[in-house]
Amino acid sequence: MLPEASSLWLLRLLRDVQLAQFYRPILEELNVTRPEHFDFVRPEDLDNIGMGRPAQRRLNEALKRYRSGVKSKNWVYKILGGFAPEQKEIPPRSDSPLCFHEPEGGLKCLIPEGAVRRGELLGSGCFGVVHRGLWTLPSGQSIPVAVKSLRVGPEGPMGTELGDFLREVSVMMKLEHPHVLRLHGLVLGQPLQMVMELAPLGSLHARLTAPAPTPPLPVALLCLFLRQLAGAMAYLGSCGLVHRDLATRNLLLASPRMIKVADFGLVRPLGGARGRYVMGGPRPIPYAWCAPESLRQGAFSSASDVWMFGVTLWEMFSGGEEPWAGVPPYLILQRLEKDRARLPKPPLCSRALYSLALRCWAPHPADRPSFSNLEGLLQEAWLSEGRCVREVTEPGALRMEPGDPITIIEGSLDTATWKGQNGRTLKVGNFPASAVTLADLGGSPVTHPAHRGSPAHGEKCRGGTDGDREKATLQDLPPARSHRTKMPLQRMRGISKSLESVLSLGPRPTGGGSSPPELRRTRAMPQRLPDLPPRPPDLPPRPPIICNSSQPTQPHKARPKRESSHNHRTGAPGASKATVPSGGPLSDPEWQRKVVEVELSVHGVTYQECQVALRTTGGDVASAIRNLKVDQLFHLSNRSRADCRRILEHHQWDLSAASRYILARS
């Protein structure tokens, strides 16, 4: 039976001093419904309901504190925040447990010890073990939960473990987000127990590493998980918290298409003007996931969580592999800072997403994107979806049948071979571009082909987000994929050559092995499978780069790009190969003159890039030149396109001077 609204104060008072079992006798036998009624209760009355004299003294002390408006001195409440006596009493819903609507910082729910039954062991941590459990609500309804119990030794819980456990409770009880694991309540028994939402499908890491015959996760679903994770981490940041342990092992699958951030044992509040948390002493931390400043100084911030987000992205697309496997923890910092090494691009990861990961791994925290920006950047890097239009049975090609959904990982209009995943078989491989057509798959959120592969197109992940673009679907994409013009790989070689010749820069140190150096602009190896992202109206397309060897490409940082569907060129829906987009007759001498003028004005660009730049600007030579210079500077730096444009304007559009300015500050 649930308490009446008028007597909630009594239940709170009794629970505060661990006398909740006397709630019904005091209410029904002694008819106490208001605090002043205790003035007429004698000690023998309390004796008659079984309350001993020590308990009576505790009750009297609690009554004094309640009447004086002083909060309870119970140790749990002192740490977690107690029930405010002046709080307005609100009766619980008939289908809810004995929960009270608490002020911010108050307990969500105190659960009777007998209401929770523990089952099989799900896992264990530094200071607790997690069991599957069953929570019986006062209404009689039972719901499956996860129960985390404080690990107790022969002499009781250690002070550090108890503090960490209660700190985790205090964090979780303030959080409410669809992609953050929810705390239902706390059991004040022996041992202390947290009753949490159950994620029945286990951790994402366990799912990624599940052996056959468990099928792999679709790469499009991994992209969805990344967006959910970015939203949850943006929420934690808005709460002034740093997670410090972001990894696939701490992402739980609440359903086949939903993850939730869990394990808040290392979460700490961000403080000070610099908005960071600095460890006070040696404590265990996940070295392979940590940012350099965390390993060097013990400093954690939202920017260090962004670094961990990049490592988590790498985990997802590498099948749950351990980052920096085989590298001793004490050498990881040296690899990151001295060698400037970064984790290599996983085979299933598009260049756009890897470029985004590299941006998350910027050496300086201020250069990393925020989680709120990452949500938009991921939208820009979204993988395109298509459908098979003819059977593919060629040796070595990805097998597909008409109607199969195909997620395009890499591909561009100037190549006849693309890379993707068959949504029916979940196999990944190369296939003829003519076998797939981009088509609206019924409103799925496949707005921008995330495989805007070339580092260039990973760069679509830079800058702010545009609401209209985020809502775009495949209907916004040109049917013939002709929005992306031919972009030969020679273009990236041109960019590298341009920067070297103009700036006289020597080769930068490599990361060694297969790890790409941070922030190095790509000297691309020959690639076979460029990508096909839509191009913004004011920006020339970037060169596709695909790494077909163990040496990872070193893509540019990802940046979001703004574009609208009316700027896309049109073509036949079933077009299999890219054609030169319309926009000016290539045989027109005036048009040829403009192309040559643009090519001579921007060192390192290709003839095809100049054509695209002119078409996107309606033949305006000056605008085309400026857009190409912005594009060049964009790939050299970790700045947004808007910043690059401002820097170029400050240097009177002198690309050489602007490049030196940026490199001096990188």
From Swiss-Prot:
The modification Phosphoserine is found at residues 96, 255, 498, 515, 582. One of its GO terms (molecular function) is non-membrane spanning protein tyrosine kinase activity. Expressed in whole embryo and all adult tissues examined including liver, kidney, heart, brain, skeletal muscle and intestine. Also detected in various myeloid- and lymphoid-derived cell lines. GO terms for biological process: negative regulation of cell growth; negative regulation of Ras protein signal transduction; protein autophosphorylation. Residues 116-383 form the Protein kinase domain. Autophosphorylated on tyrosine residues. ATP binds at residues 122-130, 148. CDD domains: SAM_TNK-like (cd09539). Residues 381-441 form the SH3 domain. It catalyses: L-tyrosyl-[protein] + ATP = O-phospho-L-tyrosyl-[protein] + ADP + H(+). The modification Phosphothreonine is found at residue 510. It is an enzyme of class 2 (transferase). The active site is at 245 (proton acceptor). Signal peptide: none annotated. The keyword Nucleotidyltransferase does not apply. Its EC number is 2.7.10.2. SUPFAM superfamilies: Protein kinase-like (PK-like), SH3-domain. One of its GO terms (cellular component) is cytosol. InterPro entries: ACK/TNK-like_SAM, Kinase-like_dom_sf, Non-receptor_tyrosine_kinases, Prot_kinase_dom, Protein_kinase_ATP_BS, Ser-Thr/Tyr_kinase_cat_dom, SH3-like_dom_sf, SH3_domain. Its main location: membrane. Residues 531-544 have a biased composition (Pro residues). Residues 457-473 have a biased composition (Basic and acidic residues). It is found in: Membrane; Cytoplasm. Interacts with the SH3 domain of PLCG1 via its Pro-rich domain. This is Non-receptor tyrosine-protein kinase TNK1. It comes from Mus musculus (Mouse).
